[in-house]
UniProtKB/Swiss-Prot annotation:
Protein name: Glutathione S-transferase Mu 5
Keywords: Cytoplasm, Phosphoprotein, Transferase
PANTHER family: GLUTATHIONE S-TRANSFERASE (PTHR11571), GLUTATHIONE S-TRANSFERASE MU 3 (PTHR11571:SF133)
CDD domains documented for this protein: GST_N_Mu
InterPro entries: Glutathione-S-Trfase_C-like (IPR010987), Glutathione-S-Trfase_C_sf (IPR036282), Glutathione_S-Trfase_N (IPR004045), GST_C (IPR004046), GST_mu (IPR003081), GST_superfamily (IPR050213), Thioredoxin-like_sf (IPR036249)
Length: 138
């Protein structure tokens, strides 16, 4: 099965699509040093062309960087997320890579400022719609 290595945070797309994978979590230490030795001890031993997190290993295929990994799973241009003028277009009948990117960006903003979407009902509605959709298996 696939192996996903990442910091101890998100793995939404694989979970949502019910994809079988082995998980390798790397935990960053606490402030002020933020010890990264869990990752640094194995970083150059994984035979990755560009050793970085996240990484995805699927057989002979070894990929690093979030967007590169997501492109492998779903071939959608990520730059659409930046164009909110077309907001209603990127969430269609099925969730796509762009929807996950959008959700992630909005959710991270809410972590820093929980009320940041209060004046944007369309974005709040998008957040609610995302995970009310049925799971899209492969």
């Amino acid at each position: 099965s696939m192996v996903l290595g990442y910091w101890d945070i998100r793995r939404m797309l694989l979970e949502f699509t019910d994809t079988s994978y082995e998980e390798k979590r790397y935990i960053c230490g606490e402030a002020p040093d933020y010890d990264r030795s869990q990752w640094l001890d194995v970083k150059f031993k994984l035979d990755l062309d560009f050793p970085n997190l996240p990484y995805l290993m699927d057989g002979k295929n070894k990929i690093t960087q979030s967007n590169a990994i997501l492109r492998i799973r779903v071939d959608i241009m990520e730059n659409q997320i930046m164009d909110f003028r077309q907001f209603s277009l990127f969430l269609g009948k099925k969730l796509t890579f762009v929807d996950f990117l959008t959700y992630d960006v909005l959710d991270q903003n809410r972590m820093f400022e929980p009320k940041c979407l209060d004046e944007f009902p369309n974005l709040k509605a998008f957040m609610c719609r995302c995970f009310k959709m049925p799971i899209n298996n492969k």
